[in-house]
Amino acid sequence: MQSPHISVLLDEVLSFFKDLRGNFIDCTLGYAGHSSAILSQNENLNLIACDKDIEAINFSLKKLEPFGSRVKIYKSNFSELISKLSSDEISNVRGILADIGVSSLQIDKDDRGFGLGSSALDMRMDKERGFSAYDVVNGYSFDELVRIFRDYGELKNASGIANKIINARNLGEITSAKELANIIGIAQIKGRGVSPAILAFQAIRIEVNGELDELTNLLDSIEKGGFKDCLVTIITFHSLEDRIVKERFKKWANSCICPPGIYRCECGNNHELGEILTKKPLTASQSELAQNSRSKSAKLRVFKIKG
């Protein structure tokens, strides 16, 4: 069963999982592109997976049927999933995978409201969640809009874009992503090669789904989860996420937890969780970029939790 979504950095992910034995957790199952490839490559691994998108889960249940009892799938986020697993399951986890991005199918499906040309204005990963992009665009104050465009879209003209939205909705509700994109403007920002609409959509999507909080909670849960001898592989798609992962991996690799500026280490200098395996993030090869232009912004970082 072919996935409607092209998994990014697949060869790189497979290279890290090829020799593992035990369980691996896919924190963002999606359409099971990475997980099905890992299971096919390595018969010594079993999958425990979670996702919040019921459409993706239903697709993946069928896609992963050939692997039978090697697969468990939960409609959950990662931090909730940990509480559902037995101590034996957790102690046998040898790999954790998270692909922190929107799937191609979600972007391309008109009713999900992620794409610039969508007739819907939604952007929810979990369609059972009440809060949507419509609520942000039509309900947020000027200051709230400026905050998300500045902090999550890294837009220099955040106030100008917020003004455009306020002025437009004063004439009537904004009901589609296509309408919103035209209000913001789709011409590329000079020197950045991307339109303000794309960055504003990113900001709204992050706000709607609490994506940065979800990522932080994911990393917190891994840190406190009691995992041993376990790979942590995380794919991000923009600088905000990558920065969070990079800084957390640095913290985990730090053996000294003494306060900054202290003259002599007094903590024992043995507090590292493990080691960073990717000093610089892995990015898409030229051949992958030729096949999937959406892989351009993907970055893979890998950490090995010690045994």
From Swiss-Prot:
EC number: 2.1.1.199
GO biological process assignments: rRNA base methylation
Pfam families: Methyltransf_5
Compartments, as annotated in UniProt: Cytoplasm
Residue numbers binding S-adenosyl-L-methionine: 32-34, 51, 82, 99, 106
HAMAP family: 16SrRNA_methyltr_H
Job description of the protein: Specifically methylates the N4 position of cytidine in position 1402 (C1402) of 16S rRNA.
Official protein name in the record: Ribosomal RNA small subunit methyltransferase H
Lineage of the species this protein comes from: Bacteria, Pseudomonadati, Campylobacterota, Epsilonproteobacteria, Campylobacterales
Protein encoded by which gene: rsmH
